[in-house]
Amino acid sequence: MLKKYRYKCHFLSDLKQFARILFQSAIAKRDQFSYDLDVESPYKIDGARIKWPNLIQGTLIKRYKRFMADVKLRNGHVVTAHCPNTGSMLECSEPGRPVYLSRHNNPKRKLKYTWEMIEMPGSLVGTNTMVPNKLVKASIEAEKVPEWTGFDSIRSEVKYGQNSRIDLLLEKGDCRCFVEIKNCTLVMDGVAIFPDAVTSRGLKHLVELQDQVRMGDRSVMFYLVQRMDAKLFRPADHIDPAYGKELRKAVENGVEVLAYDVSLDLEGIRLNRTIPVKV
């Protein structure tokens, strides 16, 4: 009996170790696929606009393992593209839909293609979550965001909170504005909603933004709707009620909420207009 117990303990220990190795391997592969829009990439920032490289059209076969998508190109070839989107992409990853890919020549990348957009009824939808931070920063620097003018510096990925990094930190003298940016792709009946899946990380960011307000800083939750068919923004209470509850609490505690849509075509993307927010 004791021998069997020891064997079971060793088996469970080995199983946990194996699961840990698989998880670390998945994270490493994800990091290998990451890239910067400013370094060794074909993207160009022109004022407040990000210009796409020559996009390649195809048809989505399937998205899998979260970061991969098989796409059939117009020439009949099937390629595997990097899907830079950690969300569920609810209603934005339907097989058979037209998609647009960029090609990257960085020799360090295992996947040479990146999934940039999908064509949905009524609008193109930007699927690349690397785009929003760069686009918002470029728009602020070009003074295209009237809510944020007069700041002396804009820094990205600044450490704050509980081992977190704020997307943008705007500063002028002693005044600091913490900006957290979320990519929104889900629209239902003209209403943009976030999140498209339960997000403990997003919940943590809301708590940390409130902490900054208590310390005398300005905090903003910015939702970038990467499509052109939304007339209103609200939290997705039916998907993640805890997030919606915390967002309303954050607003009560002084966190500002801002939503913008984009102007999006096969040439590039830019901020378009503010969308009313209903929390």
Could you describe each region identified by the protein language model?
Residues 7-10, 17-20, 24-27, 35-46:
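Short, positively charged and aromatic/hydrophobic N-terminal segments
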Residues 58, 166-196, 209:
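Conserved catalytic cores of phosphodiester-cleaving nucleases, focusing on short active-site segments
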Residues 87-99:
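Short nucleic-acid-contacting surface segments enriched for D/E, G, S/T with interspersed K/R
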Residues 90, 123-155:
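Acidic-basic catalytic patches of nuclease active cores, encompassing PD-(D/E)XK
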Residues 109-121:
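OB-fold/S1-family single-stranded nucleic acid-binding modules
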Residues 188-200, 207-239, 261:
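Nucleic-acid nuclease catalytic cores
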Residues 226-279:
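Domain-level recognition of nuclease-like catalytic cores that cleave nucleotide substrates
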